[in-house]
Amino acid sequence: MAFVTTAEVCDANQEMIRSGQLRALQPVFQIYGRRQIFSGPVVTVKVFEDNGLIRHFLEEKGNGRVLVVDGGGSLRCAILGGNPVVQAQNNGWAGIIVNGCIRDVDEINGCDIGVRALASHPIKASKKGLGEQRVSLNIAGTRICDGEWLYADTDGILVSQIELSV
């Protein structure tokens, strides 16, 4: 998609919004990383205070995808840190959405990748690898399914059942 704001996407796709094919996440996320505008096909992960499964995905080639992580909204520890974000950047991921906390904010802000998270927290998560992958999530009042498309900029985050060409 050429540079078109999420607001313009919403304006041009009112019927998709009414039908639920295009959905906006509630505005609860902080913006991190150098890439403030990003989009791509969604890969979903559901974890709780454990980042082993997240790290596993970010070790793979991203091919412009967006990893969407439902961390249960936990504010007790960070499930994403600087090292995996650097790896994600190097492996070609477009962005990472975290329904939870991150840490190593200065390092992440230096990376050419888009990251959204609820907050930062200095305590790290466990690395047991527990969680679910490629499942439907409900984050910030919005259903997000593996394989859908995500569009993010400084106005907000949209999820679409199909790739949009605006």
Swiss-Prot record:
Reactions the enzyme catalyzes: 4-hydroxy-4-methyl-2-oxoglutarate = 2 pyruvate; oxaloacetate + H(+) = pyruvate + CO2
Binding site for a divalent metal cation: 104
Cofactor note: Divalent metal cation.
Cofactor(s) this protein cannot do without: a divalent metal cation
S-S pairs: none
Residues found modified as N-acetylalanine: 2
GO molecular function, one term: oxaloacetate decarboxylase activity
GO cellular component, one term: cytosol
UniProt-listed InterPro entries: RraA, RraA/RraA-like, RraA/RraA-like_sf
Claim: NADP is one of the keywords in the record: no
EC number: 4.1.3.17, 4.1.1.112
Binding site for substrate: 81-84, 103
Main enzyme class: lyase
Keywords: Acetylation, Lyase, Metal-binding
GO biological process, one term: regulation of RNA metabolic process
Pfam families: RraA-like
Record's subunit section: Homotrimer.
Entry's family note: Belongs to the class II aldolase/RraA-like family.
NCBIfam families, A to Z: NOT-MenG (TIGR01935), PRK09372.1 (NF006875)
Job of this protein: Catalyzes the aldol cleavage of 4-hydroxy-4-methyl-2-oxoglutarate (HMG) into 2 molecules of pyruvate. Also contains a secondary oxaloacetate (OAA) decarboxylase activity due to the common pyruvate enolate transition state formed following C-C bond cleavage in the retro-aldol and decarboxylation reactions.
Name under which the protein is recorded: Putative 4-hydroxy-4-methyl-2-oxoglutarate aldolase 1
Organism: Arabidopsis thaliana
